[in-house]
Amino acid sequence: MRSAVSNLRFALCTVSLAILCCGCAAYRFGTASLYPPDIHTVFVPMFESDSLRRNLSERLTEAVVKEIELKTPYKVVSEPDADSVLTGRILNDIKRVVVEDPYDQQRENEITIIAEVSWVNRRGDLIGSRGNVPIPEALVQLSGTGVAVPEFGQSIATGQQQAIDRMAEKIVSLMETPW
């Protein structure tokens, strides 16, 4: 009687373990699971810019490349035959006064950069489209905002760099695979 109960427990444990392993077979572990496994290299051409501010597209491209190298398993390459291509265009940059003193002197400025990005694979198919978020086109619009307070020695360039860094973080976060 005792061996029959032991055999039944052993069989149940074995079946449970097999079901558990089969159910978790599609999961990946670690930070590599955040990114598509079939992509290893990314080509990031210079972002285009509709802005009249100088060097804005160069600075954003550089920030995106650094962010990709820092936070993803991808290698940024300089050739267009990479596994994927991340393109972008700066649509607008806006500087507005947030706080003024009683004499109409600027005390705080807000700099916003608006861009659209597209990440496609070698065949031209969109990568990383969000399953829950309906995106009708291959382009995703993002914005990054920075603040400059002249009283603290911050210039407009400081606010622009803050907006560029935030924009680069958002662009790279789009490269993550949705849950």
Predicted regions and their residues:
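Bacterial N-terminal signal peptides that target proteins for export
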Residues: M1-C13
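Membrane-targeting and insertion segments and their boundary/processing signals
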Residues: F10, G30-D38, E58, R89, ...
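N-terminal start-of-chain detector that recognizes signal peptides
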Residues: A18, F47-E48, L56-A63, S84-N92, ...
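Second-shell loop/turn segments in exported
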Residues: E48-R54, P150-Q160
